[in-house]
Amino acid sequence: MKQQAKSRKPQQPEYIFQVETLSHEGRGIAHYGSHPDHPADKHGKKVFIRYALPGETVKAQITHEAKRLEEAEMVALLAEPSANRVEAVCPHYGICGGCSMQHIHPDEQIRLKQNVLQSHLQHFAGIQPEQWLEPIRSLQSDYRRRARIGVRYLPKQDRLILGFREHHSNRLTSIHTCSVLDKKLSDSLPELRNLLQSLKGKVHIGHVELAKGDHETSLLVRHIEKLNNADVNQLRQFALHKGWQLYLQPKGPESLRRIDEEQGAMRLHYALNAFDVNFAFSPLDFTQVNATVNEQMVQLACELLQLQQGERVLDLFCGLGNFSLPLARCVGAKGVIVGVEASEEMVQRATDNVKRNNLVQASFFSQDLTKDFSHHSWANQGFDALLIDPPRAGAYEIIQYVPNFGAKRIVYVSCNPATLARDAGVLVQHGYQLKKAAVMDMFTHTEHVESIALFEKIQEIND
């Protein structure tokens, strides 16, 4: 891993360690005392070593010291590598902070993520699912269909950096390729960097965002000062050449404007073909970055809910309708889908998507789900099933209210195993049982753990 050597700090000590196991985020764990050169006063102290794997003997440089543990970075592998070690595919791996597990075999990444979920469920809720489902895997390595890429101009060097932040740093590292970014987007990075370098107002550009629909691509340029007409025209010509939509954003989200309006409305699109639904979205809208995992996830959610024609489903944190529209197909014209989302703009987007797909059985409401919502009409209806897809903070406030919905089945989609486990414990207290769970490799080569879980209401037995 040649990239790592560039970040070594000679003043920091280096030691030899025997790596014992992996932490939840994929770092090797070792202890002082396993080698004669270890300081005696550190005997037994735990060390977390980036890039090291269990069973390996490594030389590592200490990067951070605390009272009970230390952090380090592997600088040399001294013996046979672990069977789970693979060669990182990205030339920027080790400096760029985007990926953290490219050195770990994909199967081991999945196993580690499932262990993380199992551990959190046991620790926070004291439960395990009755059945572990097969993990949902990414079907391609270049899975990311959107990315925010930092821009920084260095006047003294007359050099523009286009790239991602370094690990645990605000410093940008320049990249010319990204192995997890959609290949067409990745291949465009050098050309995009050269374009930005040529602009007079490059010092005013903070970042760019690339987003890809099924058939369209957008380039969004975030700038803090107005760009002159010549710069805007250069950007426009680049977008025309690439066949991309071009957007400028000088301030907040409300300032977003499309420059090449003659090419169409401010929209990208993606489809979930298994459900015959199509979504329109803006470059700033939240969409899942991994298209293949998203489609598998939506299919599994619908299968787990076992929806029947005419049933009523509540979709909480519904966004632009990624689950709502497929659920509407499952319950048919006589069913009811109610979607709730904090963002009024996303509620409007979901409503528009329902109309474009002729799904009259779905309706949407704007509501901050961390606040009291019990007085709203939608909250006082009965539902056969719930789908909950919260942010990392989880859905603790909503979970308290769940018994009032009367749902027999709940599918919880999570991007944080700790908050899923916490909320699962509350659901169990409310009389639900964790039936099935699976991890989803939405963010391959990173420590992020996405998961999906099915809870079913325990039937009460009358005496």
Curated annotation (Swiss-Prot):
Its EC number is 2.1.1.190. It comes from the Bacteria. Pfam families: TRAM, tRNA_U5-meth_tr. It catalyses: uridine(1939) in 23S rRNA + S-adenosyl-L-methionine = 5-methyluridine(1939) in 23S rRNA + S-adenosyl-L-homocysteine + H(+). [4Fe-4S] cluster binds at residues 90, 96, 99, 178. GO terms for molecular function: 4 iron, 4 sulfur cluster binding; iron ion binding; RNA binding; rRNA (uridine-C5-)-methyltransferase activity. Residues 6-76 form the TRAM domain. Keywords: 4Fe-4S, Iron, Iron-sulfur, Metal-binding, Methyltransferase, rRNA processing, S-adenosyl-L-methionine, Transferase. InterPro entries: 23S_rRNA_MeTrfase_RlmD, MeTrfase_TrmA_AS, NA-bd_OB-fold, SAM-dependent_MTases_sf, TRAM_dom, U5_MeTrfase_fam. S-adenosyl-L-methionine binds at residues 288, 317, 322, 341, 368, 389. GO terms for biological process: rRNA base methylation. The active site is at residue 415. Belongs to the class I-like SAM-binding methyltransferase superfamily. RNA M5U methyltransferase family. RlmD subfamily. Catalyzes the formation of 5-methyl-uridine at position 1939 (m5U1939) in 23S rRNA. HAMAP family: 23SrRNA_methyltr_RlmD. This is 23S rRNA (uracil(1939)-C(5))-methyltransferase RlmD. It comes from Acinetobacter baumannii (strain SDF). The gene is rlmD.
